[in-house]
A protein has these predicted regions:
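Non-catalytic C-terminal accessory modules of carbohydrate-active enzymes
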Residues: 201-341
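Short loop-to-helix capping motifs
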Residues: 25-26, 99
């Protein structure tokens, strides 16, 4: 994309953190910190009272209209949410490089943006953001923007607001026949917001079919790679990863492989927390790390869940079996773990 598409341009800020979380190497954050700061400062010059109003919005969102610019969700809502996200990443970076002044300054800026976002887009009487579309509600939920300021001006999470907005999100998905209406931008936030709140069964329902919008519909028409539009007959590219955001759910939730919550360790310590869903009986995946290949497969039959795990040398896996609260910590080697399902 050209400049001024915040949802794409913030890759300057996100990629160094993805690298850090994956490899435990913070060198890119330190190297590109000045660039991150300049980009945020640029966005600040384009904002009007904390609101950004340019970009593509939820590009290629789904509905009874020609795909393209955002139709279901206001462009300023999408742009401002990503503005907030960018600043929050910069705050993390400022802390890591030891810049106390920037930490305070950009924390204050982030709070101002969140206040402006909620003032502009939150309908408190209905607990809906923007138009109430799936992207409108999923973005602030994902970014934990459902907050209120206390008497001292400090922002804290509003659990009641979060629950009401999330309930509205679920209702909208169900009202559309367990189908999404999000686009290239909103897909990830919808899927991950549902996953973070334990709605894995709903995610499975949303994609385990052969209708549009869905991957099965593309397969019906012979697609061997993801197509740019949910209905490949509509033209556009037949080799476009744009709608591939479910891949994150496949690895992080369905198979359950994800890095430790202590990012500095990269995958020297990692989590395996599989989420069996629906009538799915078998899942298998592998993930290449600096330390070797993580192999995971599971079966779910006759009320028994069987997990096979291969842990690379000099690494540790923290395994959460379905329905069990206490994890099992295992060292390098090959294991089979069984539990009731």
């Amino acid at each position: 994309w050209s400049s001024d598409v915040c949802s794409s341009d913030l890759s300057l800020v996100i990629f160094p953190f993805m690298y850090y979380e994956t490899y435990g190497d913070d060198s890119l954050i330190k190297k590109y910190y000045p660039n991150m700061r300049r980009y945020v400062d640029y966005l600040k010059t384009r904002a009007d009272k904390g609101i950004l109003s340019f970009g593509l919005g939820d590009w290629y969102d789904y509905g009874d209209f020609r795909a393209g610019f955002s139709r279901n969700t206001p462009v300023p809502l999408v742009a401002t949410a990503h503005y907030y996200m960018t600043v929050m990443y910069l705050v993390k970076a400022a802390k890591m490089v030891g810049n106390d002044f920037d930490t305070r300054y950009y924390t204050s800026l982030a709070q101002d943006i969140m206040a402006a976002f909620n003032k502009c887009f939150l309908h408190k009487d209905t607990a809906q953001y923007g138009t109430g579309s799936q992207c409108s509600n999923a973005l602030p939920l994902f970014l934990q923007m459902t907050q209120n300021a206390d008497e001292q001006g400090n922002y804290q999470s509003d659990a009641d607001l979060h629950e009401k907005v999330f309930t509205n999100l679920i209702k909208d998905v169900e009202a559309h026949g367990n189908r999404l209406t999000t686009g290239d931008v909103g897909n990830r936030y919808l899927i991950q917001t549902l996953a973070r709140n334990g709605e894995h069964e709903l995610i499975y329902k949303m994609f385990n079919h052969e209708e549009a919008p869905g991957y099965g519909f593309q397969l019906k028409f012979g697609a061997t790679t993801l197509t740019e539009q949910w209905d490949p007959r509509q033209g556009s590219s037949w080799n476009h990863f744009m709608m591939g955001q479910i891949d994150e759910w496949f690895f992080n939730s369905l198979v359950g492989i994800r890095p430790s919550t202590t990012p500095k360790q990269g995958y020297q310590k990692f989590i395996i927390a599989p989420q069996p869903v629906g009538d799915l009986k078998y899942v298998k995946a592998s993930y290449e790390t600096l330390y070797g290949t993580i192999n995971v497969d599971w079966t779910c039959e006759n009320g028994t869940f069987t997990l096979n795990v291969s842990v690379p040398v000099n690494t540790t896996a923290v395994v959460y079996l379905p329905g069990e609260k206490e994890p099992k910590e295992i060292q390098s080697g090959t294991y089979q773990l069984v539990c009731a399902k």
